[in-house]
Amino acid sequence: MEMVNIKINNMPLSVPKGISILEAARMAGIEIPTLCYLKKINEIGACRICMVEVKGARSLVTACVYPVNEGMEIFTNTERVRKSRKTTLELILSTHDRKCLSCIRSGTCELQQLCKEFSVDDEGRFDGANPVHEYDDSAIHMIRDNGKCILCRRCVAACQAQHISVIGANARGFDTHIGSAFEKPLDSVACVSCGQCIVNCPTGAIYEKDDTAKVLEAINDPEKFVVVHTAPSIRVTLGECFGMHIGTNVQGKMVAALRRLGFDKVFDTDFGADLTIVEEANEFLGRVQNGGVLPMITSCSPGWIKYCEHYYPDMLDHLSSCKSPQQMSGAVIKTWYAEKMGIDPKDIVVVGIMPCTAKKFETKRENQSASGYPDVDYSLTTRELGRMIESAGIFFKHLPDEEFDNPLGDSTGAAVIFGATGGVMEAALRTAVEKLSGEELKSLDFTEVRGTEGIKEASYTVNGMEIKVCVVSGLANANTIMEKVKNGTADYHFIEIMGCPGGCVNGGGQPIQHAVVRNFVDLRARRAAALYEADKDMPLRKSHESEAVKRLYAEFLGEPGSHKAHEVLHTSYVARPKYK
């Protein structure tokens, strides 16, 4: 790698040739502010906040896209630079809805933080004509409020990176705004509800629909029995809402907080994940042994499922018919558990705590009501739970560690790793390989399918039969693999697809980290590492060994793939138009 010698604020530095001034400054421990930059996703220099002085240049340059070269002298904090940044912030605010006190991003807004750093007041020096701002709340999962949009185009780039591109910059000049094609509302386009636009937005222009008031109303209703269950990844991300290190496992404190919020029972979605694996492994083995449609593709990610329904409606038979762990958990709670406890399912309210905004859409899907009532009534994001805990005055960090309630609080290590890309595949392999071979696995770690790469392939020989698998995360990568499946060049037997890059640990409902952190820290790897540690410490690490799952089959379902299991745990899919 060729190196060049530069100076930043008179400090000599040797850096790789061709990197941006922004990256070079970071290597020197200097943070240059930005509002639009997302590494390898949105590198367009649009916001003009990152302007710096370069000796010999006639004007300020954008640090995020300007490459360094030999002998360059850069100044990041001169009076000229600071004045430019402050003026730019004032211009942004001139058309901004400055209702910061009630904004969902107050305290985590990157624009708000920069205005504070550069002493920008609220007098509106450049206030003038204001455009009409669109407010779109048509979608089940999120709201777009263009009054808070700063045209950074991060959401557009995130949507493009997902190979969706349902939002973009419309019109020109002063009338430029972010919107859907043909100015249609979000519920009328092929948005898959993944929420990657939300976690990348620097302001409150895009955010999830908040269902916490409805959940609190149910908790306070004496006629309702309110049950909550939490997805595998939540235990290693919720702590970030309270300033804890990325990847801190707060499972015990999370359970304690949920009890203090007033939920009648606190269950673990990991139970549903174990159940999903048992059913999914049985379905996979059936397809392999009976000449069924292959490759079989996982169905845990609702963003991926909606993508498939919009973009590959002729390939829905490749999808596993298994419901997701969220929906399986809800279905079991309102059938088997309700029966055991003598509670009418109409009086049970099931709340899922999920890393995912698409889970909100999933609760409204067809064929998701095994008891005659919705399997899951409300799905809250990690962020919504964080806000509930904070508003209840609960000191999260000081809570004691508590255990989940049984019987749906019992789970295995295989379920914990669902939150990482490759986790579903690894969990399924632990069960499927044992069932195929009839022998106990010597090693439970299928490391070939781990890691944050977008596409991973592996092959295993079991009883003389080669099983080829593929693990995919991010919908752009899903598109690549689905094209291979479509044209017959994919020789896989089993494919795991997660809608969000890196899987659920990077879901659209997870805590929003500042872009500086997202650009220079691998959130996905840190969060996933905590899940693998949790798996390693579990007494049982194979889903089919779960005592709670065994009990469910013995008392209620019969056997994997039974008629009863299909009634309660399986679903179907529908072709969806791209526009309506």
PLM features: residue spans?
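Iron-sulfur-associated redox domains of electron-transfer enzymes in respiratory
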Residues: 5, 12, 17-77, 81, ...
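Terminal leader/tail segments of proteins
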Residues: 1-2
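Fe-S ferredoxin-like electron-transfer domains
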Residues: 48-193, 206-221, 225
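A short, structure-level motif marking secondary-structure boundaries and short turns
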Residues: 5-8, 97, 139-142, 181-183, ...
